[in-house]
Regions:
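Hydrophobic alpha-helical bundles in membrane proteins
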Residues: 85-238
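Generic surface-pattern signal
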Residues: 15, 19, 36, 40, ...
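Exposed alpha-helical structural elements
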Residues: 5, 9, 48-49, 73, ...
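Cytosolic juxtamembrane regions of integral membrane proteins
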Residues: 44-107
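Acidic-enriched, low-complexity/disordered segments with a strong bias for Aspartate over Glutamate
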Residues: 22, 29, 37, 58, ...
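Serine/threonine-rich low-complexity intrinsically disordered regions
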Residues: 3, 45, 70-71, 112, ...
Length: 238
């Protein structure tokens, strides 16, 4: 049976590994379970079982420089976790950003230029403001990441604000669609008299990246809020 003092020792050890708190909680549960099993099966003391468990996790948790430009040491376990989180948010964004992008293309094919301009802006701004509203409606939860800035509460917190990066291209698109919606309607539908490949790519990518950034942030927000509920009971130990 693991005592409170021993649990504290395990927590402090894992905190020294600078794991995100949501990941630390999961690893902590594995440590406790593994230590208990080793004690029971091999008739070892807590200290002996703890050392044996630490050794079994050493390769996974040991940080080292992987040739990154930021010179940050990172463990294999964290690389794996980072990759999983990136893929989760990426696939969510790819999946859901396709729908409004196709809708904009449909509008460009079936509506007048002025209507196309206003409807496209409505979709883009609507999605962006929805992301902002969701953020501020859960502001107290998102604020925890700043309050406990010495720690990473969850890796999802790094992607919550990606939608802010899109404001520059958003204003660019706004100006272009207001000033000359007909030109960009023709570009999007490949009806321009002298289509310029670079311009076509720029317009498509600008619109798609704005929408993609919004859904990437929405995925990060959703996962952050899910993980922060697991983290809250642990905050008293920080």
């Amino acid at each position: 049976m693991i005592t409170e003092q021993q649990e504290s020792e395990i927590r402090n050890y894992l905190l020294s590994k600078k794991l995100p708190i949501d990941i630390l909680i999961e690893v902590n549960d594995h440590f406790i379970s593994q230590i208990s099993d080793v004690q029971r099966e091999e008739n070892l003391s807590f200290e002996e079982a703890f050392e044996k468990t630490k050794l079994s996790w050493d390769k996974e948790l040991k940080p080292y420089w992987r040739g990154n430009l930021n010179l940050e040491d990172i463990s294999d376990f964290m690389v794996k976790t980072n990759t999983e989180i990136f893929r989760t948010n990426l696939f969510f964004a790819l999946k859901y950003s396709t729908i409004p992008t196709l809708l904009i293309f449909f509008i460009a094919l079936n509506f007048k230029a002025e209507t196309f301009g206003y409807l496209t802006l409505s979709i883009i701004f609507g999605l962006t403001f929805y992301t902002l509203i969701k953020y501020f409606s859960n502001y107290q939860d998102f604020k925890l990441a700043k309050k406990y800035k010495k720690y990473v509460l969850t890796l999802h917190q790094h992607s919550v604000f990606i939608f802010l990066i899109i404001f520059s291209p958003l204003l660019n698109i706004y100006t272009r669609l207001i000033d000359n919606p007909e030109k960009y309607q023709k570009i999007i539908t490949f009806q321009s008299d002298k289509p310029i490949f670079i311009e076509i790519v720029f317009i498509f990518m600008s619109i798609y990246l704005i929408i993609f950034g919004v859904f990437y942030s929405l995925s990060a927000q959703k996962n952050y809020l899910k993980q922060i509920e697991k983290v809250k009971p642990f905050l008293k130990y920080l």
